[in-house]
């Protein structure tokens, strides 16, 4: 059984027990979080697709920790113009473990 849900403008495909990185949610480690925006649930041959969300479906997860990703550096240089731009970005994330997929 797997589910597809939406969080922070992105879609994630998860199974029970999987560990994923979500956008930062400012929660304490070991706390529980409920993800309600479930787009689809697939259980063997049975597929349940929501319009836009599956009614009564939710995903229960546990927060493992919060952190920051590796730095991504973008560099632009315009030749012969002595013009350059360097920017760095680090993503803040919350690492969660999927405990249970509930479909009614």
Curated annotation (Swiss-Prot):
Sorted UniProt keywords: Ribonucleoprotein, Ribosomal protein, RNA-binding, rRNA-binding
Primary role: This protein binds to 23S rRNA in the presence of protein L20.
UniProt entry tagged with the keyword Ribonucleoprotein: yes
Protein name: Large ribosomal subunit protein bL21
Subunit structure: Part of the 50S ribosomal subunit. Contacts protein L20.
Family label: Belongs to the bacterial ribosomal protein bL21 family.
Cystine pairs: none
Molecular function as annotated in GO: rRNA binding; structural constituent of ribosome
One GO process term, biological-process aspect: translation
Source organism of this protein record: Helicobacter hepaticus (strain ATCC 51449 / 3B1)
CC per GO annotation: cytoplasm; ribonucleoprotein complex; ribosome
Keyword Ribonucleoprotein included in the entry's annotation: yes
